[in-house]
Swiss-Prot record:
Belongs to the HAD-like hydrolase superfamily. PpaX family. NCBIfam families: HAD-SF-IA-v1, HAD-SF-IA-v3, HAD-SF-IIIA, PRK13288.1. InterPro entries: HAD-like_hydrolase_sf, HAD-like_sf, HAD-SF_hydro_IA, HAD-SF_hydro_IIIA, HAD_2, HAD_sf, PGP-like_dom2, Pyrophosphatase_Ppax. GO terms for cellular component: cytosol. Keywords: Hydrolase, Magnesium. The lineage of its organism: Bacteria, Bacillati, Bacillota, Bacilli, Bacillales. Its EC number is 3.6.1.1. It comes from the Bacteria. GO terms for molecular function: inorganic diphosphate phosphatase activity; magnesium ion binding; phosphoglycolate phosphatase activity. Hydrolyzes pyrophosphate formed during P-Ser-HPr dephosphorylation by HPrK/P. Might play a role in controlling the intracellular pyrophosphate pool. The gene is ppaX. The active site is at D9 (nucleophile). This is Pyrophosphatase PpaX.
Length: 216
């Protein structure tokens, strides 16, 4: 089956929001729980939804913690977000070649739109599925299924690209092919354990992979 659709995670995949996310967590946690969390403590928080993360820390303050996190995140967004090499050119080329492209993220839509505008990727994506659009987040298949439905695409014709196990397992649960990015903050070996179909060292690696898949 040929691939005609590529779904991307956003944070850590299309745009480098690692420092923004870490700083947002540390600011929020230092405000409410001074001197209890270090940088390495918050790395596991990258990937799950804010609600899932904060509910494990203090269920009575979840909404308050989310509000504090998002306020800092929005205020410092443009100074802390960076672009990844070859991402813009690759997505541009995929669109030019006629691929359907979408984003499946656990972020809130307002923050997603800030990131896409900052990176100038907003012109390429017709379908963006955020946490505001679904009942269940990755690795549940619902967000991917929703994106595929909106793109009028079948799972067996799609590839999910991401930097976290939620993306790889989510793709597997939805029946898509999967590609992990080696620039994940959690390390290449971490993602290899989830057996993605492909490992990308830079985003432009996607182009020959898709070309080979669609030639066979």
């Amino acid at each position: 089956m040929k691939i005609n659709t590529v779904l991307f995670d956003l944070d850590g995949t299309l745009i480098n929001t690692n420092e923004l996310i870490i700083s947002s967590f540390l600011h929020t946690l230092h405000t409410y729980y001074p001197n209890q969390y270090k940088r390495e403590d918050v790395l596991p928080f990258i990937g799950p939804s804010l609600h899932d993360t904060f509910s494990k820390i203090d269920e009575s303050k979840v909404e308050e913690l989310i509000t504090s996190y998002r306020q800092f995140n929005h205020d410092h967004h443009d100074e802390l977000v960076e672009e990844y090499e070859t991402v813009y050119e690759t997505v541009q080329e995929l669109k030019k070649q006629g691929y359907k492209v979408g984003i499946v993220t656990t972020k809130a839509r307002q923050t997603v739109e800030m990131g896409l505008k900052f990176s100038k990727l907003d012109e390429f994506f017709d379908v963006v599925v955020t946490i505001d659009d679904v009942e269940h987040v990755k690795p549940h298949p619902e967000p991917l299924q929703k994106a595929l439905q909106l793109l009028d695409a079948k799972p067996e014709e799609a590839l999910m690209v991401g930097d976290n196990h939620h993306d790889i397992v989510g793709g597997q649960n939805a029946g898509t092919k999967t590609a992990a990015v080696s620039w994940t903050l959690k390390g290449r070996a971490y993602l290899e354990a989830y057996k993605p179909d492909f490992m990308l060292d830079k985003m432009s690696d996607l182009l020959p992979i898709l070309s080979d898949m669609n030639r066979s």
